[in-house]
């Protein structure tokens, strides 16, 4: 049974518009191919990190994904997020 999820990605701040759009399109395709529905993508903008660095960056671009999917779909997508060098961090929450 599909559940509602929210995933926040922190993306490298040095990506220009075209590579960023390509990254988001790839991620959207991966989710849809694995059965995710109701996908909404929101760009939350660039923010400085609070006194620390992630992979030598002091800021990151926050992108929020809201969707409904099976748990196995989320696990498959997170495997892809782990190996993508443009993504500094991510966190997925199940929404009630």
UniProtKB/Swiss-Prot annotation:
What SUPFAM superfamilies does this protein map onto? Ribosomal protein S6
UniProt-recorded Gene Ontology molecular function terms: small ribosomal subunit rRNA binding; structural constituent of ribosome
GO CC terms: cytoplasm; ribonucleoprotein complex; ribosome
| Matching Pfam families | Ribosomal_S6 (PF01250)
Matching InterPro entries: Ribosomal_bS6 (IPR000529), Ribosomal_bS6_sf (IPR035980), Ribosomal_S6_plastid/chlpt (IPR020814), Transl_elong_EF1B/ribsomal_bS6 (IPR014717)
One GO BP on record is: translation
Sorted alphabetically, which keywords does the UniProt record give? Ribonucleoprotein, Ribosomal protein, RNA-binding, rRNA-binding
Listed transmembrane segments: none
| HAMAP family in UniProt | Ribosomal_bS6
**UniProt similarity note:** Belongs to the bacterial ribosomal protein bS6 family.
Function (record text) = Binds together with bS18 to 16S ribosomal RNA.
Q: Which NCBIfam families match?
A: S6
The name this protein carries in UniProt is Small ribosomal subunit protein bS6
Write the gene name.
Answer: rpsF
